[in-house]
């Protein structure tokens, strides 16, 4: 029986994780649920899953949850960063699902890694912001790191065992691998007229053709910044050079990514677009459990198509690839800028095409400096957010 902590329990990854746990009740137990401020959602999850601990990042939300929870459930409610770190590093905890969106997930995820936990990484920003520090912490603690993102999980499944066992420190060429092919659907605006993009609304951007996701990641998919962040994450997870990574647009989202070998072979991972599949894989690796996902019906799939990304349509993807080549400081800046820009777009403060403008301005203007600690990363992240908000004021 594995005791699990779910960071981001009220989000879409949290819901999918709890679904897989419910399908395999003899193997997994919800030890703790962690959320930001969604009291009613957390209350419902507590009643259903009976965790020992419910942690709310927002202290007022924690008080509200405490007042609403039936006493007979005997669930401890906590709040505060120190309490969260104590929770993910507790000796009772076996596995941590790291699914808090954005930079907010970095500190607890890194704490779980340093404690040597089995970490299921759905928070791509952790590696985007702190790649080298994160990988070194994994190596030092002996933590098990498993990628939940559908693309990285697909790549992981297509890799030989010696690479799987050495994430972040592997040598792809020595294992006969020539390229990693990172697939992406192209999002809801793949075929829209370029001139129409400036007028696209948050509702349109969040209407993904294949996946069910939260608002931030949906917008990132529409700009293909999501694929850019995944490009950076793949660089750290699989220890790649930029020329070993390629982005391929695949609108049907049936092939979730591929690995190309030196002998000409290409191994692909396929399946219906449902996050329960990679979550179940990570939870049970190296075994297999039921995810509750319908098997892929090849007779219903029809045709599969592929094309190169158009960087005029997806400037955020180009910025991410460029930042990856520049190094850790640039990717930290880009991630922070993008979080501010996407939030502003979702709130109707800026237009869709302004997201790339804010990102580009920050990437070219925020001073970069060497980062040797988590404090350095957080400081650069904060500095970038201030500059990004200044750019928003100019666009308003």
From Swiss-Prot:
Single GO MF annotation: NADPH binding
Name listed for the protein in its UniProt record: 1-deoxy-D-xylulose 5-phosphate reductoisomerase
Binding site for Mn(2+): 149, 151, 230
Enzyme Commission number(s) of this protein: 1.1.1.267
Listed InterPro entries: DXP_reductoisomerase, DXP_reductoisomerase_C, DXP_reductoisomerase_N, DXPR_C, DXPR_C_sf, NAD(P)-bd_dom_sf
Family named by the database record: Belongs to the DXR family.
GO terms (BP aspect): isopentenyl diphosphate biosynthetic process, methylerythritol 4-phosphate pathway involved in terpenoid biosynthetic process
Gene this chain is encoded by: dxr
């Amino acid at each position: 029986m594995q005791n699990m902590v779910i960071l981001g329990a009220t989000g879409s990854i949290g819901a999918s994780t709890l679904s897989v746990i419910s399908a395999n009740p003899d193997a997994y137990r919800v030890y703790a649920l962690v959320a930001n401020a969604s009291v009613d959602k957390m209350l419902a999850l507590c009643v259903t899953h009976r965790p020992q601990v419910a942690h709310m990042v927002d202290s007022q939300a924690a008080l509200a949850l405490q007042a609403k929870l039936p006493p007979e459930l005997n669930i401890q409610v906590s709040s505060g960063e120190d309490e969260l770190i104590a929770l993910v590093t507790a000796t009772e905890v076996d596995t941590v699902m790291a699914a808090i969106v954005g930079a907010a997930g970095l500190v607890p995820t890194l704490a779980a890694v340093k404690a040597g936990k089995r970490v299921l990484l759905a928070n791509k920003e952790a590696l985007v912001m702190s790649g080298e520090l994160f990988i070194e912490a994994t190596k030092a603690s002996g933590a098990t790191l498993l990628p939940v993102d559908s693309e990285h999980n697909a790549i992981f499944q297509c890799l030989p065992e010696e690479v799987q066992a050495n994430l972040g420190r592997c040598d792809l060429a020595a294992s006969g691998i020539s390229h990693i092919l990172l697939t992406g659907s192209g999002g809801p605006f793949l075929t829209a007229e370029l001139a129409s993009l400036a007028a696209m609304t948050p509702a349109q951007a969040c209407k993904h053709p294949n996946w069910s996701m939260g608002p931030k990641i949906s917008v990132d998919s529409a700009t293909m910044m999501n694929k850019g962040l995944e490009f950076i994450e793949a660089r750290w997870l699989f220890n790649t050079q930029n020329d070993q990574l390629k982005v391929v647009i695949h609108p049907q989202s049936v092939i979730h990514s591929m690995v190309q070998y030196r002998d000409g072979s290409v191994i692909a991972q396929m399946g219906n677009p449902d996050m329960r599949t990679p979550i179940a894989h990570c939870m049970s690796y190296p075994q297999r459990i039921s995810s509750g996902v319908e098997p892929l019906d090849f007779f219903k799939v029809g045709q599969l198509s592929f094309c190169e990304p158009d960087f005029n349509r997806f400037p955020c993807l180009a910025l991410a690839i460029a930042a990856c080549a520049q190094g850790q400081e640039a990717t930290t800046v880009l991630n922070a800028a993008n979080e501010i820009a996407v939030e502003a777009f979702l709130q109707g403060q800026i237009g869709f095409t302004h997201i790339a403008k804010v990102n580009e301005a920050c990437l070219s203007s925020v001073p970069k400096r060497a980062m040797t600690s988590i404090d350095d990363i957080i400081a650069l992240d904060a500095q970038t957010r201030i500059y990004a908000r200044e750019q928003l004021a100019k666009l308003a």
